[in-house]
Amino acid sequence: HCQNLAEAGGADDRTWQAYLSTQARPGQPAIDARDRIGTGPWYNFDGIMIARDVAHLHGDTIELARLGNNLTKRTGLTEKGQIVPGLNDYKHPQDDVWEYVRTTPYTNRHEILTGSQLDGTAFPSELDYTCDNWTSNADPEPGPNQGGMGMGLYPGRPNAQIGFPDRNGGGDGSWNSSHGTRGCSQTALAMTHGVGKLYCFAID
């Protein structure tokens, strides 16, 4: 998918990978998003450096964590050089309803699927943080706690961990690991302001 997006954006002279972790399954080891994206440095559509290497991207040391990477609302651009609409950009009472969101491009859609922990590694396998390793579009069965969002309220149910390029939203506001979704269908993703977007990194 990232390669197709790069082609549409005129950057298909590079090899692109999605920043996605997968969880361990019987006979299948976990794959960490941080190990899928090359070594850096990475630049956005406008040529601005986002991070110089994997350690800088994730803040692996105290010094790097204090420095932080350069992924922000204004630098986390799409393959067409556009800012990803986020909270307070385009308010509408239906901006968490998929049927509205899918036909209205200027809606809050700042959630990025990652399935990852803050350090870019996969979650333990006991609970689902990856929509069954990106193969499921199932949603939780109706039940208690349907008014909230994320794994704190839906332990073990179909779910994906997300981040925010604008670092503004529920959970801790992290770029790569803020909170979970309400399920794995397009309808469920929209309920917490997502449309299934990915972070794409050039690996060469």
Regions found by a protein language model. Give the residues of each.
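Secreted/extracellular ectodomain signature
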Residues: 1-204
